UniProtKB/Swiss-Prot annotation:
Domain of life: Bacteria
Name listed for the protein in its UniProt record: Protein Ves
Entries under InterPro entries matching the protein: RmlC-like_jellyroll (IPR014710), RmlC_Cupin_sf (IPR011051), Uncharacterised_HutD/Ves (IPR010282), Uncharacterised_Ves (IPR023482)
UniProt cross-references to PANTHER family, sorted A to Z: PROTEIN VES (PTHR37943:SF1)
Amino acid sequence: MEYFDMRKMSVNLWRNAAGETREICTFPPAKRDFYWRASIASIAANGEFSLFPGMERIVTLLEGGEMFLESADRFNHTLKPLQPFAFAADQVVKAKLTAGQMSMDFNIMTRLDVCKAKVRIAERTFTTFGSRGGVVFVINGAWQLGDKLLTTDQGACWFDGRHTLRLLQPQGKLLFSEINWLAGYSPDQVQ
């Protein structure tokens, strides 16, 4: 289990100066050729997403103005707050900030031949399935994960195991991304 606080994470500026990324975790850890990776990006200007052949990307707008996504003849989509959207990461996708203001989004990328991610917003206590990886990011409220208290802009990632996230207040929102390994793969086999 790895814990993080977005406000304390290192920031990597994009080469095109259109934004910045805070990497949450990769699996296998510290590998350039990852099977899955979670990050938070701040987008300050219109531009294209980086290409990652053989990967799927799920992007979820966390805050800021809506973002219009366009991929040639494949899709046009307006990304709205807390509504995950998946697309192939090997296609050119242009992002346009619709309100002209900076936006922040959560990204999870998975290698298509190894695993698949599912992203959802939780508003109540829940338990994850065992032997799957996952990432949580607190949007608001106070959540208990094991002996750790998580609040706004904090989270955790893990590579296997069963975990309960307990909402400690009457209301709260948490982004949860679950990693499902395809047949023939497991975290132990791919490290």
